[in-house]
């Protein structure tokens, strides 16, 4: 294969790689509660992790600041793709694709499957009160979730170019959703079973929008005399007023089987409105036995139905095989080098140009259900100090995650409690903490992190992709 052809091929592969990344990034634009507060005494929002948990006082939240949760998680960190290198005597920050970063260094922090996620929740308004034989809450909140999965082969292709024989990046996918939520919760003691308390919540969701992007198949086989590339991708956008923009691709070598075609070049948003609705349930129980407190909850068991959905796709699997092209260095022939290279470019363009498949009537998806299991132990000789162990597992298809968290919780005085904890799970090791100031009547302030910030880049961006903040102001009465 001649040098000009190899150069052209490398450029095409680079375009494919960048296009694949661009498809995932827009979607990257369910830990919506702080797990550090699960065992924390007098934590106002424990019932959101287990609906059986109640409060000692009635309360009303400060609008929009009653329970603010911002969380970023990932196994792919900024320090894995950005490096400091001395270039021409000057220290510069460069991407992993820079020639001054070796392949070994670039791939050191890249896993076979790299996860990125953000989970944000704002409690717009919340209130809790004692009535009907138990404790009741009503919450109005806004929720936004983003998940992305990037295979290690995606980064290897971007770094190495075409040095390996095969690349498989089929696990490249992203999901984003936003919705409003109204939740009603009730919990009570079961008098017939001393120590047992149960609770349940019903939730109504109003969908703002959702986007799913995924490569069902993306393969590149590099033989000595033949290359084969295959792609199969879909994007589903459930956003009111959204339509895809299209452009017409004009082949460099038009002819039978290679006619002009329309492809998705972007999107337009005309107006704003609700895009779906859903319903969910929380179920929970806790049982106190001697110095132990056992708890179990299933949170967000339900569905979300999204309305009209715009679908863009490769329309099945697309394949390009280079041995179908015969190159002739005689410029006067139909299969001259330039003509065949143009035809090859046309075919490679079809691999990543998506077709507007029109509108689907609707999509129904299950909510990301979380199962929380915990056990707490109070020291017999100093009951103000308790230790807790919990497991949380979020069931969300390819974005499923789990974590174990061990915590020490102390409440030295009536108006103050605190916790420090360590966690390990899908997203690695974390250290969490929370401080909780609470009077029986008047004022409650809490602040904490499930994932404590580590080192920051010069721009103030965390080098580790795990970070969170939980903050709230409420008024007990």
Language-model features, listed with the residues they occupy:
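Bacterial Sec-dependent N-terminal signal peptides
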Residues: 1-35, 477
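Subset of outer-membrane beta-barrel
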Residues: 32-477
